[in-house]
Regions:
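Helix-biased detector of long, well-ordered alpha-helical tracts
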Residues: 1-168
C-alpha cells in the first residue's frame, strides 16, 4: 500500500497440529501462486502450531524514494477510490460461525485472492498523494487515520461505496 513493487516475501503460518498435511500444502501453494502472480519470490518463512489457522506474508519491495505513498499525504481536493467492496471482515467472521452461504464463501475467497497489483499499476501512473489498505481497522478507521495524519477533512459519498450485499 505504498506504491512499491513486491520482490521478496516470507511465509507466516500458524496451523493446528491436527490439520492434514495436504491442507497445509494447499495453503502454501496458494500463497506461492499469488506471490508468483505478483512478480515476487518467497525466500523463506516461519510456521508454528496454533488452534486457529492463519497465513500471511511479510513482503519487501522497492519504490523510488520520491514516490513512497503513505496514509498521511492526502491533499484538499483529492478523490478517494476504493478498489474492492467493503464487508470482507463481516463475511470471514460469519464463516467462522458457520453462517455464510456457499456463494458468500466463494465471493470472499475470490476477493481475498485478488491481488491489488492492477490497482497499484494504475495508481502509479497518476499523482497520488496518499493510499492505505482497508483491513481490520475498518474503512472508517482508515479514513479517520488518513484525515488526521494529512490534516484534511474527508467528504464521503456513502451511496457510492460498494458494499458486499451478504455483509449487510
Amino acid at each position: 500500500a505504498m506504491g512499491g513493487e513486491p520482490k521478496l516475501c516470507l511465509n507466516i503460518m500458524a496451523v493446528p497440529e491436527s490439520m492434514p498435511k495436504e491442507a497445509v500444502h494447499d495453503i502454501l501453494r496458494g500463497g506461492y501462486d499469488k506471490v508468483y502472480e505478483a512478480g515476487a519470490l518467497i525466500t523463506g518463512g516461519h510456521s508454528i502450531y496454533d488452534d486457529e489457522p492463519k497465513y500471511g506474508l511479510a513482503v519487501t519491495g522497492f519504490v523510488h524514494p520520491d514516490k513512497v505513498l503513505t496514509n498521511s499525504g492526502a491533499k484538499p481536493g483529492d478523490a478517494l477510490f476504493l478498489t474492492k467492496p467493503l464487508g470482507i471482515g463481516i463475511l470471514t467472521t460469519a464463516e467462522k460461525a458457520d453462517l455464510l452461504s456457499e456463494n458468500g464463501k466463494a465471493f470472499a475467497v475470490r476477493l481475498m485472492t485478488t491481488l491489488n497489483k492492477a490497482a497499484r499499476d494504475v495508481m502509479v501512473q497518476y499523482r497520488v498523494h496518499a493510499c492505505t489498505d482497508v483491513t481490520g481497522f475498518s474503512f472508517l478507521g482508515h479514513a479517520s487515520e488518513m484525515a488526521t495524519g494529512s490534516d484534511v477533512q474527508l467528504e464521503i459519498n456513502t451511496a457510492a461505496i460498494d458494499l458486499i450485499p451478504e455483509a449487510l
